Amino acid sequence: MKPSIVAKLEALHERHEEVQALLGDAGIIADQDRFRALSREYAQLSDVSRCFTDWQQVQDDIETAQMMLDDPEMREMAQEELREAKEKSEQLEQQLQVLLLPKDPDDERNAFLEVRAGTGGDEAALFAGDLFRMYSRYAEARRWRVEIMSMSEGEHGGYKEIIAKISGDGVYGRLKFESGGHRVQRVPATESQGRIHTSACTVAVMPELPEAELPDINPADLRIDTFRSSGAGGQHVNTTDSAIRITHLPTGIVVECQDERSQHKNKAKALSVLGARIHAAETAKRQQAEASTRRNLLGSGDRSDRNRTYNFPQGRVTDHRINLTLYRLDETMEGKLDMLIEPIVQEHQADLLAALSEQE
């Protein structure tokens, strides 16, 4: 391992011990805000510190085994111990490099999921419904909570657009690479000739930001329209203008919310989605500016022109960003997404590691 990385790890290990001592200080315990901040830092440093301690122990084992090689009676055993220690050292180095990667502060946050039907008319709306069901099943398996914020149903089923908030541990970090184009190839139910049609949907995943981090929005930049809800809600539906449409005039971003019976609640929800969209647009703009001065666009989720193709006749799903093809479409549509998400997370980590090596 490079000396510069070892020095960085030593500093983090020392900070971990320092924070541990501070957490036992009566003055710190009395200051709840400081105590919470240090507790978070301690938790973040614990894995790195533990892994680095293991790595240091293995370096001692390697040194001991190398000394034993000079003893003819111990040589065979020393060679075996040396091989095992070097193997373990390599594994720990890989773990440490991943632990040192810059963390996206949004990864642990809840997320807004938007699925929109694109080209393909009714079939695209049906596929948008299939995608939303797929993500809902995945969320259910991970014990996340799905709350529909707004939806516009297709004429023959599915959705022209659906927006949901997904709450739970690490939602955004897990779903952020889903943003982009999703294409389906299948025979629509309305197709009498049995011809395969291609339709498309777009998916957007944005972190839910705490109020303090939401972008400043000038009320004068907003046009707020009210209209009658067309969704579920029993007798109350279509009797009051409870649904809200907010247009952010400088960017042209439009958000609708009609899920709640209360206009006030719909407005609050719509504003939170609007803030997330503006933040996402600003982040994308900043990353594009950074990319123009760097060789690769890293850590942006900008793998999005055409994420996946779902080919129903062949039972195939292909992720074009990493050239991954799996013949497990049925499982995918039932929400078993880890087999697709994990490889792209690993690819992203590999990109970051390459950038880290270049910096070193």
Swiss-Prot record:
Subcellular location: Cytoplasm
PTM comment: Methylated by PrmC. Methylation increases the termination efficiency of RF1.
GO cellular component, one term: cytoplasm
Post-translational modification N5-methylglutamine, affected residues: Q235
Chain segments carrying region Disordered: 284-313
GO molecular function: translation release factor activity, codon specific
Pfam (any one): RF-1
Keyword Cytoplasm on entry: yes
Keywords of this entry: Cytoplasm, Methylation, Protein biosynthesis
Chain's role: Peptide chain release factor 1 directs the termination of translation in response to the peptide chain termination codons UAG and UAA.
Family from the record: Belongs to the prokaryotic/mitochondrial release factor family.
HAMAP family, A to Z: Rel_fac_1 (MF_00093)
The name this protein goes by in its record: Peptide chain release factor 1
Gene name, Swiss-Prot/TrEMBL: prfA
